[in-house]
C-alpha cells in the first residue's frame, strides 16, 4: 500500500510541475512548487531538475530502489488560471488540508480549466493593435487599420495553430499579412501612417513573456533555462521582423510602397 501511495504521490508532483511549465509558469517556481508538494506528501529524498521543456526527478522509498521520472514538455502556452490553480493546490497540501486522492482530483480540474475562446482572443488582438498604434505615434485614423491588421494576425495564428504549424513560420506569415494590409491601405489613403499601424499590430505578436521569464531565470541563477527562453524570444522576434521585411519587399516590387 505504501508503494502505491508513493508512486501516486510522485506522479502527482510530476503532473503538477508539467502543468506549470505547459502553461507559462517560471522554471524556478515550478521546481520550488514540486519540492514543496513532495515534502507535503511525504516523498523523501526528492530531487528535481527543471528546464524550460523538461523535468527530471528522482525519489527514494525505504526498502525499494530509487525511482526516476522524466517528462518532456515540448510546447509552452500561457494560461495563468491553471498556474494559479496549481499554486493554490500546493498551498493546500503544505497546510495539510489535502491527501493524495483529493489532490489528484484538484489537479485534474486545474489541468482542464478552459482557455479563452477564439472570439475573445481575436477581440484582444484587435483592441490591442489599435491601442498600441495610437501609443506609438499613430492617429485615430491609423487605429482601424491597425485593428484590421491585428485581426488578420489573430486569424492566421489560430488557423496555423489548429493545423500544428510551428510558431516561427506562423509569426512570419502573420507579420507579412499585417504589413501588406497596412501598406495597401496607405497606398489608397495617403493620410494613413502605415508604420504606426504595423508597429501597433506587431505588438500583439512580440514574445514579451518569453523575454521576461528568460531574464528572470538568469537572475535566479538558472542560466540554461534562461538562455533557452531568450533564444526562443530572439527567434520569434526575428521571424516577426522577417515577415515585415517580406511584406515591404513585395510591396516595393508591386510599386505600392
Predicted regions and their residues:
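Alpha-helical membrane-inserting segments
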Residues: 131-136, 152-161, 177, 181-189, ...
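Cytosolic regulatory modules rich in charged/polar residues
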Residues: 28, 98, 102-115, 168-169, ...
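Generic detector of multi-pass transmembrane helix bundles and their immediately adjacent loops
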Residues: 186-257
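Cytoplasmic-side transmembrane-helix entry/capping segments in multi-pass membrane proteins
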Residues: 145-148, 166-177, 200, 227-232
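Hydrophobic alpha-helical transmembrane segments
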Residues: 64-75, 85-93, 115-122, 141-150, ...
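Alpha-helical transmembrane segments and immediately membrane-proximal extracytoplasmic
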Residues: 49, 66-81, 95, 109-126, ...
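Internal active-site segments that recognize and position negatively charged phosphoryl groups
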Residues: 108-167
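Soluble N-terminal domains of membrane-associated systems
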Residues: 1-97
Amino acid at each position: 500500500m505504501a508503494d502505491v501511495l508513493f508512486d501516486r504521490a510522485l506522479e502527482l508532483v510530476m503532473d503538477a510541475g508539467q502543468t506549470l511549465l505547459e502553461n507559462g509558469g517560471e522554471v524556478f517556481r515550478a521546481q520550488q512548487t514540486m519540492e514543496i508538494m513532495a515534502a507535503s506528501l511525504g516523498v523523501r529524498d526528492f530531487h528535481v531538475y527543471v528546464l524550460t521543456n523538461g523535468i527530471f526527478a528522482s525519489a527514494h522509498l525505504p526498502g525499494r530502489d530509487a525511482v526516476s521520472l522524466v517528462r518532456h514538455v515540448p510546447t509552452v502556452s500561457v494560461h495563468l488560471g491553471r498556474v494559479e490553480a496549481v499554486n493554490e493546490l500546493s498551498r493546500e497540501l503544505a497546510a495539510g488540508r489535502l491527501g493524495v486522492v483529493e489532490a489528484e482530483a484538484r489537479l485534474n480540474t486545474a489541468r482542464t480549466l478552459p482557455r479563452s475562446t477564439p472570439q475573445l482572443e481575436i477581440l484582444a488582438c484587435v483592441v490591442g493593435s489599435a491601442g498600441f498604434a495610437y501609443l506609438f505615434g499613430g492617429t485615430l485614423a491609423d487605429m482601424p487599420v491597425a485593428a484590421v491588421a491585428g485581426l488578420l494576425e489573430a486569424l492566421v495564428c489560430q488557423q496555423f495553430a489548429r493545423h500544428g504549424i510551428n510558431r516561427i513560420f506562423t509569426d512570419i506569415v502573420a507579420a507579412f499579412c499585417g504589413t501588406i494590409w497596412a501598406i495597401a491601405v496607405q497606398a489608397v489613403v495617403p493620410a494613413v501612417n502605415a508604420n504606426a499601424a504595423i508597429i501597433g499590430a506587431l505588438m500583439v505578436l512580440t514574445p514579451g513573456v518569453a523575454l521576461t521569464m528568460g531574464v528572470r531565470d538568469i537572475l535566479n541563477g538558472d542560466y540554461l533555462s534562461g538562455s533557452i527562453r531568450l533564444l526562443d524570444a530572439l527567434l520569434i522576434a526575428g521571424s516577426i521582423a522577417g515577415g515585415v521585411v517580406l511584406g515591404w519587399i513585395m510591396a516595393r516590387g508591386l510599386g505600392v510602397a
